[in-house]
Amino acid sequence: MIRSTSLFSLLLRTHVTQQPVRVWLSLLGVSLGVMASVAITTANVDVLRSFEQAVTEVAGSATLEVLGGDLGVDETVIMAVRAAPGVTAVLPVIEEGIVMAQGGRHGEAVQLFGLDLIGEVGTRGFRLQPASGRDALEQLLASDTAYLGEKLAEDWHLNVGSQFEVIVGGRAVRLHVAGLLHTETARSSVWNRAMLMDIAAAQVLFESIGRLDRIEVVTAQDYPLEDIEAALRAALSPNLTIQRPAQRTKQVEQMVRAFQLNVSVLSWVGLLVGTFLIYNTIAFMVAQRRREIGIYRALGMTERRVAALFLTEAGILGIVGGIVGGITGVLLAGNLVSLVSQTISDLYVPISPGLAVMSFNHHLWSALLQGVSLGTIVSMIGAWGPSLDASRTIAVRALAPGDYEVTQQLRLPGFAWTAGGLFSLAAILSLLNPLAGLPVFGYLATLCLLAALSCLAPICIQALGFRPRRAQDFLLGPGGSLRQIAVSHAARHPGRNGVTVSALMIGLAIMIGVVVMVRSFRQTVELWVNETVIADMVVAPSAWLHGRNVGQASRALPGTWAAKLASIDGVAAVDTYRDVHVDVQGQSVALISRNLRLHAQRSRYLVIEGDSATMLRRAADTGGVLVSEVLANRLGVREGMSIAITTPAGVQSVPIVAKFYDYATDGGKMVMDRAQYQALWHDDRVTVFPIYLDVGADVAAVRRSIAQQVMMNEQGVASPLVISNAELRREILDIFDRTFVLTYVLEAIAVFIAVLGIMNTLVTAVLERRRELATLQAIGASPTQVRQLVLWEAAYLGALGAVLGVIGGLLLAVVLIKVINKQSFGWTIQMTVPIGVLLQAVILALGAALVAGYWPARWAANQPVVEGLREE
C-alpha cells in the first residue's frame, strides 16, 4: 500500500512539473473564478452584517420599537406606550443624517443620534468622555454641543472643545465637541463613527420640537412580548408601526435580496468558465499521456486508479486555486464593500460607509474554506469527464501506432438533440412564475441556453472540416494553405476545441447579454427622464444629493419658500414636490405629493393607458392616486380599484386613476395631489421645488436670484442646491451608471478567464503537434509560417466563439430583460440592440484569441527541428 501511494505521488509530481505553464494557467483561471465569487459573497454579507450590527447596538436593551415612517412619531405617544402592561422603560430616539460643511471632509454624511443622555448613558454600549472646565449637566444638555465617536473625531481632525460646521435641515449650524464616545468593545462599532446629542437638543437642532424618529421600548422578561405588542397596537394610532428591532434588518434583506442574488449569480460565471478551463487542462493531460495510460493499464492499474490519478491532479489544482482565490477574494471584497454599500444606499436604504469596513482577519478563514470548497468542486466537475475517459482507455489501442484521439468519434447527432432539448427547456422555464419573488426559473433558463450553445460548439468546429472546396481553394484567400491546415487541425479535435470555444462563448455571451440589457435599460431611463423631467431647474436642500444617507430633516425645505420663489423675476411657476414613505396595505411605499394641476399643465407622467394631463387632473379632482407599474404589480391592483393607505387619521381607501412607468425605485411609488396630502398628514414641508421659467428667462440670473432671496430672508440658512434641468438629468444617469460598475468588473473577470482557456488550448496544442510542426519546418516551412499557422487556429477558435457568443448574448439579453429583470424588479424595459457593442465584442474576441495565441505561436516557431523529429 505504501509503495502504491509513493508511486501515485511520484506520478503526480512528475505530471505537474513536466508542464508548469499549463498548470499555472489553470491555477490562475480557478483562482480568478473563486476570487470573484468569494469577493461578492463576502462583501454582500459584510454590508448586511454592518447594518444589522448598527441596528442591534443602537437598540441596546430595547425589545420593541414604535415607528411612524418618514414623518416620525409625536412625543405625546410616550405616555400611552409607558402605560402599556409589561413596559418597563420608554426610550425616545432621533436618528438623522447631517453633512460636514468644512475642511477636507466637506460633504461627508454622518449619523447623529438624539438620546436621553441622563437616563441612557451606559445602557447602549458606550460611555462619554466629557470636556473639563464646564458644568457637566449644562454641557450634557446644551443645544450647540455634540459627542463624537473616536474614529469620527480622528477622521475629521477634531478634539474635545473643537468647533465645526455642519448642514442640518438646509441650515448651516456651528457645533462644538463636548466629548468623545468610548465603546465598550474592541470590535468596530456604530458609535465609533456616529455623533450624539441629548434628545431635547437634537429636537431643537432639527427643528422638530415634539417629534421623534422612533420610540424604543424595554419590556419585562416575564411578560409575553406578543401580548405587549397587541396592547400597544390597540392603544396607538394605526399609522404607527410596532415591531422588533431585528425586523428592520429582515426588511432590508428582503429589499436587497434580488440585487444581491443577481450580482452573486454573475460572480459565478467566472467559476463556470473556470470549469471549462479545468476540463480542457485535464483533457489535454489525458490526450498527451494516452500512451502512458495504456502502459499503466497494461501493467495492471485499475480503471478506478487511473481516474483517481487525474481527479487528484484536478483536486490539487482546485485546492491551491481555492486558497489563492480565497485570500485575493477577501482583499478584493475590501474594495467592493464600499461599492456595494453605495449601490444599496442609492437604491434601497442608507448603509453607513463607516460601518461597512471589512476586517481581513475576521473573514480570512471563512473565505479560505469557501475558496477551497468552490475550487475543489469546480475542478472535480471539470475533470470528471476527462478522468472517466482516461479510465476507459483501451491499452491495445493506446499502445498501437497512430493517433488514439483521431480514432475517437464524437456522437454529433447526440449533441444536436441535446442542444435542441435544452433550447426547448429554456423556453419553457422562461414562461414560469418566480419563486418567492425571485427569478429562479429565469436563471435556470440562462443556464440551459449556455449549455445548449456549448453543445453546438463541437458541431460547428467539425463542420469547418466538411466545408466543400476545390483543391485550388487551398491557395486562395487570406492565409492560403496555412489557413486550410489550421482549419483542418481544429476540425480533427472538435471535443476539446469545443470546450475552448464554449468557455469563450460563455464569457462573451454573459458580457453581451448584460451590456445589451444595461444599454436597453439606460436608453429606457433616458427616454423616461426626457419625457418626465421637464422643470427648468430644481431647488433642493444642500444635502439632497446624499439621498437617504441623510434624514428627513436634511432632505426637506419649508413650504413657505414656494411663494418666495414664485416672486422671483423670470419664474413662471413653482411646484411643491414631497417624497415620503407611508404604509400601504402593510408595505412601505414611496408617496409623492405635488400640485397635480400644475404638473398637468407643465409636465407629464408616462401613463400606460390614457393621456397624462387628463389622468393628473382626474386624480386632483377625485382625490385619487396614480401608481407606478412596479407598485401595481407588487400589490396586484389596477386602474379603477382602490388602495388602502394608512394615515394619522386611520386607513383611507383611495381610488387608482392610472398606472405609469417609473424607474426611480424598484419598490414602486404612488402620486397624489399636495392638497390631499396636507389634509391627511398635516405636513407642510417640501422635498424639492421644481421651477418652471418664463420663455427667454436667463437661467443663470434666476439661479443667482434664488440664492440671494433665500439667504436674505432666512437667517442661518445654508445656500440651497439650484440644479438645472441638464444637471439633474446627468445626476440621475450618473446614479444609474454607478449601479452597474460592479457588473462590469465581474464581466471582465469572466472574459479574462476565457482568454486563459484559449491560451491553455493553444499551448497544449503546440506541445501535442511538435512533430507535425517540426516536419513542416523540415520540408521548408519558415518560422513565420509556423507562427501564422498557430495564429490562424487561434483566430478560428476566436471567431467561432465570437459568433456563438453574439447569438448567446442576444438570447441571454432577452431572458434578462423579459424574465429576470421583470421578475426581480418589475420594470418594463424596451430592448434595443447596440450594433456597435456587438462589433466591439467580436473584435474583442478575435483580439483576445490572437493575443492568447501569440506566445504559443512564437514558442512553436522557435523550437529546434531536431528535437521535434527525435521520435521519428
Where are these regions (language model features)?
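Alpha-helical transmembrane segments of bacterial inner-membrane membrane proteins
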Residues: 1-872
